[in-house]
């Protein structure tokens, strides 16, 4: 599933082509994704200028004067920028095209767990949308601190890794990035969230930011389907310290990396470096 780095890579790739351009038309070939595509989406966006492209968690927010269209990539979704001249014929899993003057923004999603929604301006600020209102803080915002993590986890017995994945404290820290952040912070993923000290949470907050920044710089992680807006795969996963390295020697101390299952997801850690 595309996580925050993959969505941010997509946003950065799309924004220079989209911002300040008008949507000439929208072709919706699949009306049902995770939720129904708004029946009036094409009408709402026709001839509208895209004012900005933002990201909130794993959601992309495209602002026009009348509101915002919201895109979630789901498990296998991608957004590609394709030149109008010679654009490929839409294939089976190419569900929606936004056509601009010189290019097409194409949404592809083989498993159809993604979503395209419309939030009219008269409904209020897009960040109050039900899908966005309860999200945790952004990891690159000043609000994301070790003190926040420490305060929000007091008395919680859930593991620190599962607390990171929940998304109610901080958004976008998916499975691969949780494992890598905990490795960098030296925290064992099975530790109860409520038992992690403030200094260790401060290290974890720094590790989360550093891990996500590195992933964005490397184009995200391509574990199965993800490609950026230019069709290129990410390569963060090639340099992981822990994730998907079960049985291999730790890059720091040489101890074999262990793999366990937490909440039906694989977790990887070094039993020596992480305490």
From Swiss-Prot:
SMART domains listed in its UniProt record: Fapy_DNA_glyco (SM00898), H2TH (SM01232)
Active site positions, chain numbering: 2 (schiff-base intermediate with dna), 3 (proton donor), 58 (proton donor), 265 (proton donor)
InterPro entries in the cross-refs: DNA_glyclase/AP_lyase_DNA-bd, DNA_glyclase_Znf_dom_DNA_BS, Formamido-pyr_DNA_Glyclase, FPG_cat, MutM-like_N-ter, Ribosomal_uS13-like_H2TH, Znf_DNA_glyclase/AP_lyase, Znf_FPG/IleRS
Swiss-Prot/TrEMBL cofactor(s): Zn(2+)
Any GO BP annotation: base-excision repair
EC code(s) of this entry: 3.2.2.23, 4.2.99.18
Catalytic activity: Hydrolysis of DNA containing ring-opened 7-methylguanine residues, releasing 2,6-diamino-4-hydroxy-5-(N-methyl)formamidopyrimidine; 2'-deoxyribonucleotide-(2'-deoxyribose 5'-phosphate)-2'-deoxyribonucleotide-DNA = a 3'-end 2'-deoxyribonucleotide-(2,3-dehydro-2,3-deoxyribose 5'-phosphate)-DNA + a 5'-end 5'-phospho-2'-deoxyribonucleoside-DNA + H(+)
Cofactor binding annotation: Binds 1 zinc ion per subunit.
Binding residues for DNA: 93, 111, 156
Superkingdom, taxonomy of origin: Bacteria
Zinc finger (FPG-type) residue numbers: 241-275
Any Pfam family hit: zf-FPG_IleRS
Family: Belongs to the FPG family.
PANTHER family: FORMAMIDOPYRIMIDINE-DNA GLYCOSYLASE
The protein's assembly and partners: Monomer.
Its biological purpose: Involved in base excision repair of DNA damaged by oxidation or by mutagenic agents. Acts as a DNA glycosylase that recognizes and removes damaged bases. Has a preference for oxidized purines, such as 7,8-dihydro-8-oxoguanine (8-oxoG). Has AP (apurinic/apyrimidinic) lyase activity and introduces nicks in the DNA strand. Cleaves the DNA backbone by beta-delta elimination to generate a single-strand break at the site of the removed base with both 3'- and 5'-phosphates.
Record's protein name: Formamidopyrimidine-DNA glycosylase
Origin species: Burkholderia vietnamiensis (strain G4 / LMG 22486)
Biological classification of the source: Bacteria, Pseudomonadati, Pseudomonadota, Betaproteobacteria, Burkholderiales
């Amino acid at each position: 599933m595309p996580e925050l780095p993959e969505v941010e890579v997509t946003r950065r790739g799309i924004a220079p082509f989209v911002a300040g351009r008008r949507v000439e038309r929208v072709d919706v070939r699949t009306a049902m994704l995770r939720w129904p595509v708004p029946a009036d989406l094409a009408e709402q966006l026709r001839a509208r200028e895209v004012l900005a492209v933002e990201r909130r968690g794993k959601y992309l927010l495209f602002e026009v004067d009348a509101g915002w269209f919201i895109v979630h990539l789901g498990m296998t979704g991608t957004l590609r920028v394709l030149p109008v001249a010679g654009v490929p014929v839409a294939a089976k899993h190419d569900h929606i095209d936004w056509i601009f003057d010189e290019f097409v923004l194409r949404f592809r999603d083989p498993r159809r767990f993604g979503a395209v929604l419309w939030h009219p301006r008269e409904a209020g600020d897009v960040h109050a949308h039900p899908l966005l209102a309860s999200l945790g803080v952004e990891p690159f915002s000043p609000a994301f601190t070790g003190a926040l993590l420490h305060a929000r986890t007091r008395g919680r017995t859930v593991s620190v890794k599962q607390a990171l994945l929940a998304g109610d404290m901080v958004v976008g820290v998916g499975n691969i990035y949780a494992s890598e952040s905990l490795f960098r912070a030296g925290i064992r993923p099975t530790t109860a969230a409520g038992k992690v000290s403030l200094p260790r949470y401060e290290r974890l907050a720094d590790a989360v930011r550093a891990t996500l920044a590195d992933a964005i710089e490397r184009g995200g992680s391509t574990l199965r389907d993800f490609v950026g807006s230019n069709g290129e795969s990410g390569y963060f996963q090639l340099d992981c310290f822990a994730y998907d390295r079960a049985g291999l020697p730790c890059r720091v101390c040489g101890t074999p990396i262990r793999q366990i299952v937490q909440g039906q997801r694989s977790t990887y850690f070094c039993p020596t470096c992480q305490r």
